[in-house]
Regions:
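Structural signature of tandem alpha-helical TPR/SEL1-like repeats
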Residues: 39-51, 72-85, 104-118, 141-152
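Structural marker of alpha-solenoid helical repeat scaffolds
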Residues: 55, 89, 122, 155-156
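TPR alpha-solenoid repeat register
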Residues: 62, 96, 129, 162-163
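Bacterial Sec signal peptide processing site at the extreme N-terminus
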Residues: 20-32
């Protein structure tokens, strides 16, 4: 008696696989996850990317996309974990470097600065990296360097101009003018 239910489950599984064709690959799951994510179905995207990672733990795109889902859900620590996994697999994945820098800028500005510099070494035209690097160096008190970084960002993408803060240019320090000595009170 106990063998029949097991055979039925095996038969249902076999029929299910045969009806669907071949089992999904990590790549096909990543594609499905992306479709769900672009449609706004983050829950489906999350579980689909997780399935892809179970099938292929070295799928950098699955880790990266899962990180973006976690970011949108406000799960920053989980996003950081996924971006870090992406970079272990693919150290030159510029979008993962950038997103990791964004997510760690508050807690580790020096580390985020290094990440932005890596992004820019790989992709010097990444305007948002120049913009964000400018904010970090500004917070270090390096206003001239921040202005230079922001100028590069805006030159690459004029739409970023609205994100650049207005910081007065340094003025020349002059000695106060004092009247010449006089004999009159």
């Amino acid at each position: 008696m106990k063998a029949k239910p097991m055979m039925l489950a095996a038969a249902v599984l076999t029929i299910g696989v045969a009806a669907c064709g071949t089992p999904p690959t990590a790549q096909s799951l990543v594609s499905q996850g992306l479709k769900a994510q672009l449609a706004g179905d983050e829950s489906t995207a999350e579980s689909t990317y997780q399935q892809a990672i179970k099938l292929d733990p070295n799928n950098a795109v699955a880790h990266y996309n899962l990180g973006t889902v976690y970011d949108r859900q406000g799960k920053t620590s989980q996003a950081v974990t996924e971006y870090t996994a992406t970079l272990v697999i693919s150290p030159s994945f510029t979008d993962a470097l950038f997103n990791l820098a964004v997510d760690t800028a508050t807690s580790d500005p020096a580390g985020a600065q290094r990440l932005y510099l890596r992004v820019l070494a790989l992709q010097p035209t990444f305007a948002a990296a120049w913009l964000n690097l400018g904010f970090i160096v500004r917070d270090e008190g390096k206003l001239a360097e921040a202005r230079t970084d922001w100028a590069k960002a805006v030159a690459l993408d004029a739409s970023l101009a609205s994100h650049v803060p207005t910081i007065p240019a340094p003025t020349a320090v002059t000695k106060p003018v004092t009247p010449p000595p006089t004999s009159q009170p």
